[in-house]
Amino acid sequence: MTTQRSPGLFRRLAHGSLVKQILVGLVLGILLAWISKPAAEAVGLLGTLFVGALKAVAPILVLMLVMASIANHQHGQKTNIRPILFLYLLGTFSAALAAVVFSFAFPSTLHLSSSAGDISPPSGIVEVMRGLVMSMVSNPIDALLKGNYIGILVWAIGLGFALRHGNETTKNLVNDMSNAVTFMVKLVIRFAPFGIFGLVSSTLATTGFSTLWGYAQLLVVLVGCMLLVALVVNPLLVWWKIRRNPFPLVLLCLRESGVYAFFTRSSAANIPVNMALCEKLNLDRDTYSVSIPLGATINMAGAAITITVLTLAAVNTLGIPVDLPTALLLSVVASLCACGASGVAGGSLLLIPLACNMFGISNDIAMQVVAVGFIIGVLQDSCETALNSSTDVLFTAAACQAEDDRLANSALRN
């Protein structure tokens, strides 16, 4: 009897619903943190291993997928990168605009402290853009080691175009390597329930949520604005693109991409998850192999919200008046900063001083705002990453489905 049961159990774990398994891991993680903090801290190793495995496989996955898709791209075959890029930029700006409206409707103030720490933000938007451009000419090995996805994309695109002139054997080898890496990614993702279990247990055991209560209103504004973008703004953009009910697609992306990103708190680690979801949705591989890593770099709606809300909270605390043109300018600046957030150590929080500089707020006070961001980062960073990463696959799917509908309608007319 036992010899028959164990394979059945293994098959259920290997082929069962991943979402249900993750929910079980989530509940067990919360229970373990509540029952025994030392045990919860110990199983944190499972979460560290899971995130480490995703981060390890993501750079080589992006390199091989982009190389393979470009090298094997047939002349005349259309991709949908332009409309996806437009959706990324429009979505980020819309998120910043929504954050301005939300901050005016529910103004927040901060309890500023002087514990900003030894961190050095970029001196201006030019430096942010310079860092982004310099990352394009990074050494390919260095880009793979450091997870510099702009550099990886540049090298992958360049090598892909070069390999178009190679013989079919070489192209087949690159394609086989791409399939092999994809298999490894699927294997890593099957361990997600154990990773989520470890991440939830250790996070609750080491930090808890007691420190967040002092910033309850600010968190409500931040998370509320992110929910508004995820459930109202993004569905409107998707409806505009596909002209049908967007919510099945929106909720699918939040469930199968956002949940992972919420717990891993890393857009880079979530790239393999998004790639797998795109494959499940039967999207064009040539498109999503480029748009997903590109989105992890520049599609930063959550970062735009964080920069805008915390900047306006600092402005309210200092009693600085803000008129409509200035608020609109802040939306533009926050969008530009958010698009460059991946090129800055510390991400969106260290770009807050750039936005604060618009209102004449000194760097000392701006860094205190950054310190507040680090305090609430347990929840803020999780929600931000979930919004950013789920939007990558959402906009990619919307653009691909819109193109499929256009081609189907064109075929019917003919």
UniProtKB/Swiss-Prot annotation:
Function, in words: Involved in the import of serine and threonine into the cell, with the concomitant import of sodium (symport system).
Pfam families recorded: SDF
GO BP term, pick one: threonine transport
Keywords, sorted A to Z: Amino-acid transport, Cell inner membrane, Cell membrane, Membrane, Symport, Transmembrane, Transmembrane helix, Transport
Source superkingdom: Bacteria
Designated name of the protein: Serine/threonine transporter SstT
GO MF terms, alphabetically ordered: neutral L-amino acid:sodium symporter activity
Topological domain ranges for the Periplasmic compartment: 37-45, 105-142, 201-217, 321-331
Cellular component annotations (GO), alphabetically ordered: plasma membrane
Source species taxonomy: Bacteria, Pseudomonadati, Pseudomonadota, Gammaproteobacteria, Enterobacterales
Family label: Belongs to the dicarboxylate/amino acid:cation symporter (DAACS) (TC 2.A.23) family.
SUPFAM superfamilies referenced in this protein's UniProt entry, alphabetically: Proton glutamate symport protein (SSF118215)
TM region positions: 16-36, 46-66, 84-104, 143-163, 180-200, 218-238, 300-320, 332-352
InterPro entries: Na-dicarboxylate_symporter, Na:dicarbo_symporter_sf, Ser_Thr_transp_SstT
Subcellular localization(s) per the UniProt record: Cell inner membrane
Membrane-related topology note: Multi-pass membrane protein
Cytoplasmic side: 2-15, 67-83, 164-179, 239-299, 353-414
Name of the gene encoding the protein in the UniProt record: sstT
Reaction(s) catalysed (UniProt annotation): L-serine(in) + Na(+)(in) = L-serine(out) + Na(+)(out); L-threonine(in) + Na(+)(in) = L-threonine(out) + Na(+)(out)
